[in-house]
Amino acid sequence: MVNSAVAAAPAAPAAVPWGAVWGQDEAVATLQAAASDPDSMTHAWLVTGPPGSGRSTLAYAFAAALIAEEGDEQAMRQVLAGTHPDMTALRTEGVIISIKDARSLVERSYFSPSLGRYRVIVMEDADRMVERTSNVLLKALEEPPERTVWVLCAPSDADLLPTIRSRVRTLRLREPDIDDVARLIAQRTGADLSVAEQSARHAQRHIGMAQRLATDAAARARRDAMLRGVLAVRGVGDAVEVAGRVVAAATEDAKALTAERDEAERSSLLRTLGIAEGAAVPPAVRSQLSALEDDQKRRATRSLRDGIDRVLTDLQSMFRDVVMLQFGRGAPADGDLINRELEPELRAVASTWSVERSLVVLDQIAETRRNLEQNVAPTLALESMLVTVASGRIP
């Protein structure tokens, strides 16, 4: 049985929402042709693209086109709400996709569609599969039932095993232009175009993150303070202090993102079990509450790690700007700097550091990301990286 990691797809309008897949006309045309022409159909797809490029949105639009007959608004809404019996979506709340969840998807893939033309299995974050989990999918991807379609989503095809890549048709999404993202964000949120442009630039074209920055002045301020704090690191003491602040801020952000949902899930489960809020939980049902709490802990861990990963992405962009300045690029007119607002500080760093030191720092940021994937404590990983920022040497 698929556990709580299998979640509903995002809500969307009744018509096939191809228009919501912004700036990906070629990919949309490919999937529209596949949905309407059996000769263009492939039964296992991999949609790749940078974060925020619309991978999941495209996958759900494709599922809606495959399952719902034209004009069947009820079926369309069910698919996009994740309630259609022929639609299964896996959105993992953990750091990795479990073998249990993968096996559950494989079992469902062998059911014939009950109402629609196809049964569609969407796996978001397919890059979170470890090798053993990937192996569970191999036969289902190679020899799927005639009316089952798999759609995997990942940042890059390199994030999946060659044995998976060889069994899917890859569709690569392009990275949108910053100006186009800015116009979209301004249109969606009503934000001033200059704020939308800054947010799109800082988010490095990630539409969802750009939208958050454009609508949250506090988030913009935290990002700016974090970058300035890192530039001020001069020694081990500073590295320890700044790493602690960064992890604390990421932890608070993670709590804010998950706390309301956690409480709503707990209240819903208690109501389902017939237990009044605040009443003692009978021993017979404590295991169900414990299972929910375990799921929530995994989600909190992933949310924190995602927050730290965003910090590393921002730091990578800043020291990339330093390298650009060292190579004589980065004038505001040519649009090379991501963090233009820090240009004076970045020029000061570029003039005092060697290119080799800047590249060592960028390498250490990448190494920090790998360390976090190996479950190194975030504070320790960041401290080590910031010592490199201060000294120019890997500790």
Predicted segments with their positions:
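Flexible beta-alpha connector loops of hexameric P-loop NTPases
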Residues: E93-K100, A126, T170-L171
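Conserved catalytic/switch belt of AAA+ P-loop NTPases
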Residues: Y110-S112, N135-L152, P162
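Short loop/turn elements that form and flank the Walker-type P-loop nucleotide-binding site
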Residues: S40-M41, L80-H84, S114-R117, P144-R147
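AAA+/P-loop NTPase substrate/partner-engagement loops
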Residues: E73-S98, A158-L160
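Conserved alpha-helical scaffold flanking the Walker A/P-loop in AAA+ ATPase domains
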Residues: Q32-S36, I99-V120, R128, R132-K139
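Charged, glycine-rich active-site and insertion segments that engage polyanionic ligands
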Residues: M1-A65, E69-R77, E146-R147, P155-V311, ...
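A short beta-strand-to-loop transition that corresponds to the Sensor-1 phosphate-sensing loop
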Residues: E124-D125, L152-D157
